[in-house]
A protein has these predicted regions:
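Active-site phosphate-binding and catalytic loops of NTP-dependent enzymes
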Residues: 70-74, 164-169
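Conserved small/polar residues in nucleotide/adenosyl-binding loops
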Residues: 180-181
């Protein structure tokens, strides 16, 4: 029996094909705009997000470029980003100068960028979970007679999805001491 999605009225099976994978392009764009406007955001965003968290390939490319620029101590602004993307032959692939300048126009992005980053991360995690469950489905349908192996593989795939969240909640002793002695 397939369950209905209360919002869309679609079955679970139909939802993926009709609505696509979880993603929020506006949240992605706002995070990138905030990174363009503040070097502090670039530093913090690297802790919160990875390139694969971005659904749109152009957003992944822009994010990676800004992180590379930051790590190379290249100042991040629209002109420098356009120049950097041009130098690595990716400017046209991300929509050209027009898209970078469009991002710069989102000046309110600094206000809620952390919330938007959380949305990007949440949707990424949901996509990972969907991928893992699809793999688990395939394993179950092609299961050997020993189901223990299938269950272990399924557990492994689900744990892989949550591993990053668990890791990010742990702090080293030094981090803990710095946090509570300041």
């Amino acid at each position: 029996m397939a369950y209905d999605d209360r919002e869309t009225g679609l079955t679970v099976e139909d939802r993926g094909s009709k609505l696509g994978l979880p993603q929020n392009q506006d949240a992605e764009a706002n995070v990138l705009a905030a990174m363009l406007l503040s070097p502090d955001v670039v530093e913090e965003a690297q802790v919160e997000l990875q390139p694969d968290d971005f659904y749109r390939p152009i957003h992944k490319t822009i994010y990676t470029a800004m992180v590379d620029m930051y790590n190379s101590r290249i100042p991040i602004d629209s002109i420098s980003l356009i120049d950097y993307l041009r130098s690595i032959n990716k400017l046209d692939a991300v929509g050209g100068e027009a898209y970078i300048l469009e991002l710069m126009g989102q000046t309110l992005s600094l206000v809620n960028w952390q919330h938007h980053a959380a949305i990007v991360r949440r949707d990424s995690m949901l996509r990972e979970l969907i991928g893992a469950t699809n793999e688990i489905n395939a394993l179950a349908y092609n299961a050997p007679t020993d189901t223990k192996e299938v269950v272990e593989l399924a557990e492994s795939k689900l744990l892989k999805v949550t591993a990053r969240e668990v890791k990010s909640s742990y702090k080293t002793l030094t981090e803990f001491c710095l946090l509570y002695t300041s």
